[in-house]
């Protein structure tokens, strides 16, 4: 019988504070430009809120951008029509970031690193358009709050705060699981106006988060960014293996070659996946799955196009104008 310590599936120490300026500069030059190109600067379906409200439908003119043609209305009327939108730049977005110990685990890079890059990218995209961003961080508890603000300097502050070590995490009981509902409930009093909310988590959490998520979605535009890893649903055949729970610190010795164990794990993964999708759908929340081995530009581009396609199909069937936004929960 083989015995190995898995190098990729054990929990790593919490990441050290990042160089916020270096990270943001890299994202601006290498990622944000690619995203601009992939979406042609049109972020409807990703950045929601007042700035996406449909203002008017009118006949197409030679100078109009063909990307704004409403093909459903055009087909019904037989004349090309374009959509015009309100240019409301006063959108507020909040990032609710679950960096509990399981976020420090990953096959090649950690979920925490992926989450931080996503927040930095989206925060800069939003502030570049004149919007304001804020954040809450959860490790063992909600231990960091960044009030909403605008501008590049504010984004640097936000990145720096989220990446700082947590004194509360060190003081918390070692055998406590994630309580995502605490993060969702802590956000409620901070969001006094309709906002864009990104909930970043692996959703490996204790029960009770579904209702707080639904309450958030009743007042705000919520996207669940589910942080995953290629090893989440796989059990490598490595013989006897000592595995640990990143949340509680508990360890157990298992035989990864046991077919019965592998079948039970597969069923558990399928059941958990179905439960998550049902919870997102019930809450009316669209979910973006972001793996540690994903290209973030490709993931975001696919998400945006899918939301637009679903939204256009819904509005076409209803006989109304397509707004480019998906119905809530349609992607779950």
Residue ranges, per PLM feature:
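N-terminal low-complexity, intrinsically disordered segments
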Residues: 67-77
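Acidic, metal-associated active-site segment
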Residues: 56
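Exposed, interaction-prone extracellular/peripheral surfaces
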Residues: 1-46, 59-64, 73, 82-120, ...
């Amino acid at each position: 019988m083989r015995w190995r310590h898995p190098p990729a599936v054990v929990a790593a120490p919490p990441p050290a504070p990042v160089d916020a300026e270096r990270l943001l500069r890299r994202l601006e030059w290498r990622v944000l430009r690619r995203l601009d190109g992939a979406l042609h600067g049109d972020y409807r379906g990703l950045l929601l809120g007042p700035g996406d409200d449909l203002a008017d439908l009118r006949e197409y003119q030679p100078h109009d951008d063909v990307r704004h043609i409403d093909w459903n209305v055009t087909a019904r009327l037989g004349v090309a029509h374009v959509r015009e939108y309100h240019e409301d730049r006063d959108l507020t977005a909040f990032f609710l970031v679950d960096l509990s110990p399981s976020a420090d685990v990953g096959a090649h890079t950690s979920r925490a690193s992926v989450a931080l890059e996503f927040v930095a990218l989206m925060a800069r995209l939003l502030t570049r358009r004149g919007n304001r961003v804020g954040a809450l961080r959860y490790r063992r508890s909600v231990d960091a709050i960044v009030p909403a603000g605008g501008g590049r300097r504010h984004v640097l502050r936000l990145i720096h705060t989220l990446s700082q070590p947590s004194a509360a995490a060190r003081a918390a009981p070692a055998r406590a699981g994630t309580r995502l509902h605490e993060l969702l409930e802590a956000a409620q009093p901070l969001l006094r106006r309709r906002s864009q909310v990104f909930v970043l988590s692996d959703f490996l959490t204790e029960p009770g988060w579904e209702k707080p998520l639904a309450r958030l979605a009743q007042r705000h535009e919520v996207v669940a960014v589910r942080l995953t890893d290629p090893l989440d649903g796989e059990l490598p055949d490595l013989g006897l293996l000592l595995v640990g729970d990143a949340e509680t610190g508990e360890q157990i010795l298992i035989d990864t070659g046991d077919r019965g164990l592998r079948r039970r794990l597969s069923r558990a993964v399928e059941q958990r996946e179905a439960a998550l999708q049902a919870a997102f759908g019930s809450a009316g929340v669209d979910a973006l799955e972001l793996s540690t081995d994903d290209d973030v530009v490709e993931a975001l581009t696919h998400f945006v196009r899918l939301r637009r396609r679903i939204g256009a199909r819904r509005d076409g069937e209803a006989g109304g104008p397509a707004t480019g936004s998906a119905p809530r929960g349609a992607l779950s």
